[in-house]
């Protein structure tokens, strides 16, 4: 089964405010680099928004993290079919829309 990450894991990987979460996120991303894992455009975009607006990370530094991850992981974009699948997952499984979209994008990648 292919894995992907919610934005929070990516944020914790660069934000040292909560050291335990930071360490775990770095460890998990390291594991993922040796597994069948993708990143989504959605998660990378949300990461950029959060770390530059809420943690004060410099724009270039945030872009550097994204570039580094893109060199290691395939990056998938949502499709119209992902939209349909995400909406169905909200209806049938109670997921939030954005979590459902991450799931659908990773599944279809």
Annotate the PLM regions.
Residues 5, 39-41, 77, 97:
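Short beta-strand scaffold positions
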Residues 49-53, 107:
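Short glycine/serine- and small hydrophobic-enriched flexible loop segments
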Residues 48-49, 70, 87:
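Amphipathic alpha-helical segments within well-ordered protein domains
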Residues 32-35, 71-72, 93:
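Structured helix-beta-strand junction loops
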Residues 1-39, 54-67:
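Short, well-structured N-terminal submotif of metal-dependent ribonuclease cores
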